[in-house]
Amino acid sequence: MAVKKGDLVRLVEEKFVGSVEAQASDPRLPPYVFAGQGEVVDLMGEYAQVKFPVPTPNVWLRIDQLEAVK
């Protein structure tokens, strides 16, 4: 999936579970990460910085683990 700044995305749970990123993080991610609409605010290599519409810090996620939200 080609993403660009401003795109709305969500994290695909099946692609995230078992990944290196999941192993390095708290396994109990909040539901809004998988069901919500995060906005891509920056890109660096194979990662996208995503801002979710809740009062939490932005998070870096692998682009291949993201899915566009319509």
From Swiss-Prot:
Membrane-topology annotation of the record: Peripheral membrane protein
Domain of life: Bacteria
Record bears the keyword Protease: no
Subcellular location(s) of the protein: Cellular thylakoid membrane
This protein's UniProt keywords: Membrane, NAD, NADP, Plastoquinone, Quinone, Thylakoid, Translocase, Transport
Enzyme Commission (EC) number: 7.1.1.-
One GO cellular component, as annotated: plasma membrane-derived thylakoid membrane
InterPro entries: NdhO
GO molecular function terms listed in the Swiss-Prot or TrEMBL record: oxidoreductase activity, acting on NAD(P)H, quinone or similar compound as acceptor; quinone binding
Reactions listed under catalytic activity: a plastoquinone + NADH + (n+1) H(+)(in) = a plastoquinol + NAD(+) + n H(+)(out); a plastoquinone + NADPH + (n+1) H(+)(in) = a plastoquinol + NADP(+) + n H(+)(out)
Alphabetized Pfam families for the sequence: NdhO
Presence of the UniProt keyword Thylakoid in the record: yes
Assembly description: NDH-1 can be composed of about 15 different subunits; different subcomplexes with different compositions have been identified which probably have different functions.
Protein's job: NDH-1 shuttles electrons from an unknown electron donor, via FMN and iron-sulfur (Fe-S) centers, to quinones in the respiratory and/or the photosynthetic chain. The immediate electron acceptor for the enzyme in this species is believed to be plastoquinone. Couples the redox reaction to proton translocation, and thus conserves the redox energy in a proton gradient. Cyanobacterial NDH-1 also plays a role in inorganic carbon-concentration.
Protein family according to the UniProt entry: Belongs to the complex I NdhO subunit family.
Official protein name in the record: NAD(P)H-quinone oxidoreductase subunit O
Naturally occurring in which organism (per UniProt): Cyanothece sp. (strain PCC 7425 / ATCC 29141)
Gene: ndhO
